C-alpha cells in the first residue's frame, strides 16, 4: 500500500511539474534539458564551432539542447536536419532515437572500438566540452551507491583527460552524500577551475548536483 501511495504521489508531482510541461511543449525528451540550459546560461559552456561529447546521452535531451544551441539561423527544431555550427557526438550503451545533426554511437565508451569510432569522427580536433547526465541504478545502500556514482565520475574524468582540449570543460551529474567530497577533490586535481551547480530544474527533494571542471591542468 505504501509503495502504491508513493507511486501515485510521484506521478502526481511529475504530471504537474512545470519543467515536464515545458519539455513537452518545447519538444524535449526529458525535463533534464532545463538543468543543462540553466548551467549553460550561467557558465556559457556551449558556443558555435565546438566539438561536444554527451556521455550516457539517453534519452537525448542534453544532446537536443546542445543541438538547438548550435543550430544555424532560425532552424531550432531538433527533429529536423538544419545544420549546426559545431559537432555533437552522443554515446550510450542503450539505443537512442535519432536527433537531427547529432551523431550517435551505441556502445561502452571505455571500449577501444567505441573510442575508435569517436576519434574517427573528431579527427585531429580535440573535444571542447564533455557533458554527462549519467546516473547509476541506486540501491538505497549509501556506501554501494556512493561507489557507483564515484565510478561514473571517474570514467568521465578519465575520458576528459584523454580527449578534452586544454581550455575545455567537463560537466557531470553527482549526488551530495557519501563520497561527494572525494569526487570534488578529483576534479580539483584535474582542473584549474571547479564549481558545483544546483539548477532550479533539479527536483527539490533530489540530492543531485552538477560538478563543473574547466581548464585542464597540465600533467606534472
Curated annotation (Swiss-Prot):
GO molecular function, one term: rRNA (uridine-2'-O-)-methyltransferase activity
Active site: 173
Chief location of this protein within or outside the cell: cytoplasm
InterPro entries listed in its UniProt record: RNA_methyltr_RlmE (IPR050082), RNA_MeTrfase_FtsJ_dom (IPR002877), rRNA-MeTfrase_E (IPR015507), SAM-dependent_MTases_sf (IPR029063)
Entry's Gene Ontology cellular component terms: cytoplasm
Domain of life the protein comes from: Bacteria
Keywords attached to this entry: Cytoplasm, Methyltransferase, rRNA processing, S-adenosyl-L-methionine, Transferase
EC number: 2.1.1.166
Protein family membership: Belongs to the class I-like SAM-binding methyltransferase superfamily. RNA methyltransferase RlmE family.
Function description: Specifically methylates the uridine in position 2552 of 23S rRNA at the 2'-O position of the ribose in the fully assembled 50S ribosomal subunit.
Protein name stated in the entry: Ribosomal RNA large subunit methyltransferase E
Source organism (scientific name): Paraburkholderia phytofirmans (strain DSM 17436 / LMG 22146 / PsJN) (Burkholderia phytofirmans)
